[in-house]
Amino acid sequence: MSLNRRILLASPLILTIALAVAANAQAKDPKQIVIGTSAGPYADQVRLGIKPILEKQGYKVRIVEFNDYIQPNFALAEGALDANVFQHVTYLDRFAAQHKLALSELVKVPTAPIAIYSRRHKSLDAVNGGSTVALPNDPTNQARALVMLDQLGWIKLRPGIDPIRASERDVAANPKGIRLLPLEAAQLPRSLQDADYAFVNGNYALASGLKLRDAQRTEKISPAYANLVAVRTPDRDKPFARDLAAAYKSRAFLDVTNKHFADYAKTDYQLALQSPGAR
């Protein structure tokens, strides 16, 4: 989620055409919702769980998949999308402030955690001087990885720092002698061919064929890193936004989550639905 405008899409032209078609269709049909997602599980959540619910209410749902963390917010702000699903509130707030975009959280979604994977080693105990550790290069997700490295004892962060804003500059000691390799989030699964260990965001891990149960250490997701649906701020109370939020909060979507996304961190409203006595 680097906050520059580098686009990692295989074909920007195809995306441009897709967005143009989506925007045009939306102008003709107010019951169409165009949702941008990162490629992989969050697109699958919409496809398997949210789209069927909304279609029963008369909506036409179009999904546009992205392979980077930059363009979905610009596309939303510019009106090519009605909503997007790929980011947590820490990233959304930072990105919106930096680029002066009026975007807001609508509802949290079940989230796949960032985790450490390795194809070279069977356990974290194999770390040694010179081990290469790939991690996200965007500020918010890099901070998550650094905090986990500090918890493992591989590095030591400066006392008193804000963990949400931790950066490589805050590494006070490196007792294991590891070499940090910051990469674009989408490149992290491929880095497992060469790196000893890699922190991979949940959506990219699953999209690349990695399984959450194969991770050697998994983050315990805090509210700051739970993924969400974002909309343009003026649209938060529009009928489509209320219906979209209600779909995510429905028992039907909880059933889809339990069937297809059982290893994900559930939202508070899903946990409430599962509690004894909930109807």
Language model features with spans:
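Extracytoplasmic "Venus flytrap"
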Residues: 30-50, 67-71
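Short helix-initiation/N-cap motifs at beta->coil->alpha
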Residues: 63-74, 161-190
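Pocket-flanking alpha-helical
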Residues: 69-100, 115, 122, 207-209
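Periplasmic-binding protein-like
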Residues: 143-150, 248-268
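Alpha-to-beta junction loops
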Residues: 77-87, 131, 154, 176-178, ...
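A bilobed periplasmic-binding-protein/Venus flytrap-type ligand-binding module shared by bacterial periplasmic
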Residues: 113-124, 226-240
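Ligand-binding "clamshell"
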Residues: 94-106, 119-121, 192-194, 199, ...
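A conserved helix-loop-strand patch within extracytoplasmic ligand-binding domains
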Residues: 106-156, 254
